[in-house]
From Swiss-Prot:
GO terms under biological process: mRNA catabolic process
UniProt family annotation: Belongs to the Nudix hydrolase family. RppH subfamily.
Task performed by this protein: Accelerates the degradation of transcripts by removing pyrophosphate from the 5'-end of triphosphorylated RNA, leading to a more labile monophosphorylated state that can stimulate subsequent ribonuclease cleavage.
UniProt name for this protein: RNA pyrophosphohydrolase
Top-level class of the enzyme under EC nomenclature: hydrolase
A Gene Ontology term for the protein's cellular component: cytoplasm
Keyword hit for Hydrolase: yes
Domain of life: Bacteria
Length: 161
C-alpha cells in the first residue's frame, strides 16, 4: 500500500444523503454526471449542512439537483451506508478532505410530472436524466458506488414492488 493510499484511508467520510426517487411507475430517477467524460449515472445525493437533519437535507438536495421537491419520503434507511471514491479522485473532491461518503438513504415518491424536473439548476450536477427500472439500475451505475447501491436496493426493494 502506498503512502498516499494509507493517507487516504485515514481521511473521514463526508456525511450525506442519497435519494431513490420513484415515479408513479416505480421507475427510479438517475442523472448522468456532468463532470466526467465517462457514462456515470447515479441517483441524486449530497451533503448534510451542519445542524440539518438527514430528512431535511434529502428534500433540499432533491430540489437542488432535480429542480423539484414535489414528493414525500416513504422510508429512511435503517443504517448509514458508505463508499470510498477511487484514490485519484480524492484530491479533486471536497478539497481532498474526505475518502468518500457515509450516507443516509431515502426512498421518495415523486408526485410531480416530468415537466417539473429541471436539471439546469444554478449548480448543475447532471447533463441528462431518465427513469430507470429497478432491474437496470445496478448495471448503469458507476462501478465504485455499485456495492452501496446493491445494499440500498436490498433494503428498499420490498417497498417498491
Amino acid at each position: 500500500m502506498s503512502n498516499s493510499s494509507k493517507k487516504h484511508l485515514d481521511l473521514p467520510y463526508r456525511p450525506g444523503v442519497g435519494m431513490m426517487i420513484l415515479n408513479a411507475d416505480n421507475h427510479i430517477f438517475v442523472g448522468k454526471r456532468i463532470d466526467t467524460k465517462i457514462s456515470a449515472w447515479q441517483m441524486p445525493q449530497g451533503g448534510i449542512v451542519p445542524g440539518e437533519t438527514p430528512s431535511i437535507a434529502a428534500m433540499r438536495e432533491m430540489l437542488e439537483e432535480i429542480g423539484s421537491d414535489k414528493g414525500y419520503i416513504i422510508a429512511e434507511s435503517k443504517c448509514w451506508y458508505s463508499y470510498d471514491v477511487p484514490s485519484f479522485l480524492i484530491p479533486k473532491l471536497w478539497n481532498g478532505n474526505f475518502r468518500g461518503q457515509k450516507q443516509r438513504w431515502f426512498l421518495i415518491r415523486f408526485t410531480g410530472n416530468n415537466e417539473d424536473i429541471n436539471i439546469n439548476t444554478s449548480n448543475p450536477e447532471f447533463d441528462q436524466w431518465r427513469w430507470a427500472s429497478l432491474d437496470e439500475l445496478l448495471s448503469i451505475i458507476i462501478p465504485f458506488k455499485r456495492k452501496l447501491y446493491q445494499a440500498v436496493v436490498k433494503e428498499f426493494e420490498s417497498l417498491i414492488q
